[in-house]
Amino acid sequence: MPGCTSRLLPEGPFSRNQALAVTTAYLNVLIEDDQGTHFRLVIRNAEGQLRWRCWNFEPDAGKQLNPYLASEGILRQ
């Protein structure tokens, strides 16, 4: 569908644009520890507690984050 962005990440490393698409889709997903070229994508629960985080350059970052996005991601309306 034109104009739609994925709500999940690729299984491996991900770009800043891919991370921004995910943070735009979910209320509880944030970019933290931003070093410019690398950063962490963080998922927090409704109480703000850390559920999972990965650096964007990790070989299986998306594979680790996607199950948490699917089960604990709070979509924006």
Curated annotation (Swiss-Prot):
InterPro entries: DUF905 (IPR009253), YkfF-like_sf (IPR038612)
Domain of life of the organism encoding this protein: Bacteria
Family under the similarity heading: Belongs to the UPF0401 family.
Name of this protein: UPF0401 protein ECP_3010
